[in-house]
UniProtKB/Swiss-Prot annotation:
Reaction catalyzed: (S)-4-amino-5-oxopentanoate + tRNA(Glu) + NADP(+) = L-glutamyl-tRNA(Glu) + NADPH + H(+)
Notes on the domains: Possesses an unusual extended V-shaped dimeric structure with each monomer consisting of three distinct domains arranged along a curved 'spinal' alpha-helix. The N-terminal catalytic domain specifically recognizes the glutamate moiety of the substrate. The second domain is the NADPH-binding domain, and the third C-terminal domain is responsible for dimerization.
Annotated EC: 1.2.1.70
The protein's name: Glutamyl-tRNA reductase
Name of encoding gene: hemA
Annotated source species: Synechococcus elongatus (strain ATCC 33912 / PCC 7942 / FACHB-805) (Anacystis nidulans R2)
Length: 438
């Protein structure tokens, strides 16, 4: 079996490409089933966020397995292979393992050290199990990755004070308001802020907007419940207004800054819609942190509208990155330990066929010899006594095998483990391959 990851991220593709590859949670089950239907894919898990789409897989053969995943991505995105390939990366075995560890730890994020990615990796793990994409190998890998992400956050300070996509979006708004209005304080008081969506990203937006002095906030959502909960949780002395997305265009007229973070798969704002409601003199700032994008690219054609998306956050997060480089180096050392732990487990799988073969052979001998002994003892030897002798022989076999098996599995020197496996096969005349083929 071979381990691989095929994907793209903010490092390899712009948002215009990433949004075409996005796999919403409600589509994950179908995607996993389709991928598992390919002849070379044994296990699969999907990580889809605003900044990346990555497919982790266990394949029977690397090259055809990667080819099958690439074909799936082309069909899913409706992008020709020639157009898609320049944006894709492919990492195999140890490189794939280290990549996932870095992703879970927030070291590959646009915002270095951000914490939301770990919960997204956990979601990938949960959905992979739920939809039966995750088997023995990915189960171990994803569990190790979650452990790695937790260790980095508890044993280093990289998560302390880290900005998030939402906080970077608020900071971008602040910078643009300062530049536009020639203000030095950067306070967002007096700005009429509209938030579309009431999920995790919007929750963080509200927190950071209040911290920056925003005093007029309205939240629109597909349903009122989550929006009302958000307003109640963070409103305090501030009266946060809530409404339904169906009233979007009326709310736009009353807004100065609009943050969009809905799960819509198509744009909910475009040039035509804005032209219908905006007065010629009304200035509007749109900051879209959704992937797929909630704001169509053609809104930039409106002179009174400033439009930004997740790719525009780079200028904000760049200031945060340099101060965190040292902490990232500490985290990398921890990740090496987790990669080694997984690799040792992976290598130990080579011993499993030999161990199983030895157990089967000894069990067969035990059963044969026990049957001979019981036949000599005759019918007067009762069932109760037979059960005692059965338990006795099993106990002897298990105790004899225990220490050698533990030593074999825990041997971290790959060459020493290989020699031990070869010695077992020779001494006990074992043929694991023959057993597997039969």
């Amino acid at each position: 079996m071979h381990l691989a990851v095929v994907g793209l991220s903010h490092r390899t593709a712009p948002v215009a490409v990433r949004e075409k590859l996005s796999i919403p949670e409600q589509q994950v089950e179908a995607a996993i089933q389709q991928l598992k239907s390919y002849p070379h894919i044994e296990e699969v898990a999907i990580l889809s966020t605003c900044n990346r789409l990555e497919i982790y897989c266990v394949t029977r053969a690397t090259e055809p397995g990667v080819r099958e995943i690439t074909q799936f991505l082309s069909e899913h995105s409706h992008l020709p292979l020639g157009e898609l390939r320049p944006h894709l990366f492919v990492l195999l075995h140890q490189d794939a393992v280290m990549h996932l560890m870095r992703v879970a730890a927030g070291l590959d994020s646009l915002v270095l050290g951000e914490g939301q990615i770990l919960s997204q990796v956990k979601t990938m793990y949960k959905l992979g199990q739920q939809y039966e994409g995750v088997g023995r190998i990915l189960n171990r890998l994803l569990k190790q990755a979650v452990t790695a992400g937790k260790r980095v956050r508890t044993e280093t300070s990289i998560g302390t004070g880290a900005v998030s996509i939402s906080s970077a979006a608020v900071e971008l708004a602040q910078l643009k308001v300062i530049a536009r209005d020639d203000r030095s304080d950067g306070n967002l008081a007096g700005q009429r802020v509209l938030i579309l969506g009431a999920g995790k990203m919007s929750r963080l937006l509200v927190q950071h907007l209040i911290a920056k002095g925003a005093d007029t906030i309205q939240i629109l959502n597909r349903t009122l419940g989550r929006a009302e909960e958000l307003a109640k949780q963070y409103g305090g002395d501030l009266q946060i207004q809530v409404g339904l997305l169906s009233g979007l265009m009326n709310a736009i007229v009353e807004a100065d800054i609009v943050f969009t973070s809905t799960s819509a798969t198509d744009p909910i704002l475009d040039r035509a819609k804005l032209e219908m409601v905006l007065a010629p003199e009304q200035r509007l700032m749109l900051i879209d942190i959704a992937v797929p994008r909630n704001v169509a690219a053609d809104v930039v054609e409106l002179t009174s509208v400033e439009s930004y998306n997740v790719d525009d956050l780079r200028e904000v997060v760049a200031q945060n990155q340099e101060s965190r480089r040292k902490l990232a180096e500490e985290a990398e050392a921890l990740l090496e330990e987790e990669v080694d732990a997984f690799d040792n487990w992976w290598q130990s799988l080579d011993t499993v066929p030999t161990i199983n073969c030895l157990r089967d052979k000894i069990e067969m001998i035990r059963e044969q010899e026990l049957e001979k002994a019981l036949s000599r003892l005759g019918t007067e030897f009762g069932d109760k006594h037979q059960a005692v002798v059965e338990a006795l022989t099993r106990g002897i076999v298990n105790k004899i095998l225990h220490d050698p098996m533990v030593q074999l599995r825990s041997q971290q020197d790959i060459e020493a483990r290989r020699r031990a496996v070869d010695a077992l096969q020779m001494l006990f005349n074992l043929d694991p391959q023959g057993q597997l083929s039969s």
